[in-house]
Amino acid sequence: MRNSKKRLAIFASGRGSNGEALYKAMQDGYINGEFVVIITDHGDAGIVERSKSWNIPLIVIDRSDYDSKASFEQAQLDALEPYKVDGIVLAGYMRIVGTKLIERYEHKILNIHPALLPSFPGLHGHQQAIDGGVKITGCTVHFVDAGMDTGPIIMQNTVPVLPDDTEDTLSDRLLPIEHKTYKESLRLFCEDKLTIKGRVVYIED
């Protein structure tokens, strides 16, 4: 018998393709969770239009509306509180998550990064891989900590880097692998099959 569904918030800044893939996997019953609120820092982000048919509350919390980082982070916490979320999914969220949020939801915030961490953290992971001359790159789903893409790694998958790759072609090749990897990682999280010991995430499946 499955446990009750995990209540999840999704944070997104962009087009929301990973978020949509996760939402569909929940609707199909693959992931034992449900998005109960969407938070974006851009009112014109793609996720706003993409999620209209989901019938999920969407809240815009724009950093420019707050006079300090602390008040911005508090607004995020205040927005989440009524929804009693069990976890937060970052899907193309382009801001560093604040300390308050990390402390409140320790080991409950998941992120996907378009490179094989710990290599190529930060922005432009695809281009960093091309510039670095690596022959294989991939994506990493990890728990979020206070560093830049430094949290414990849940799962990774790979794709080849081709000699004529551009940032766009590599991004297009990696995207379906990102969807697959994030869906599987979130499934495990929602079924309480991830255990963290130090820097290592152990999977029970």
Model-flagged regions — what are they?
Residues 2-46, 50:
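N-terminal Rossmann-like dinucleotide-binding module
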Residues 7, 34-37, 57, 108, ...:
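Proline-centered loop/turn at the N-terminus of a beta-strand
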Residues 13, 63, 114:
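Short, conserved catalytic or interaction motifs in soluble domains
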Residues 20, 196-205:
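Short, basic/aromatic-enriched C-terminal tail that caps enzymatic domains
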Residues 20-24, 49, 74-81, 183:
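Amphipathic, non-transmembrane alpha-helical secondary structure
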Residues 25, 87, 91-200:
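Donor/substrate-binding cores of folate-linked one-carbon enzymes
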Residues 33-74:
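Short, surface-exposed acidic-centric catalytic microdomains
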Residues 64-95:
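Short phosphate-binding loop-to-helix
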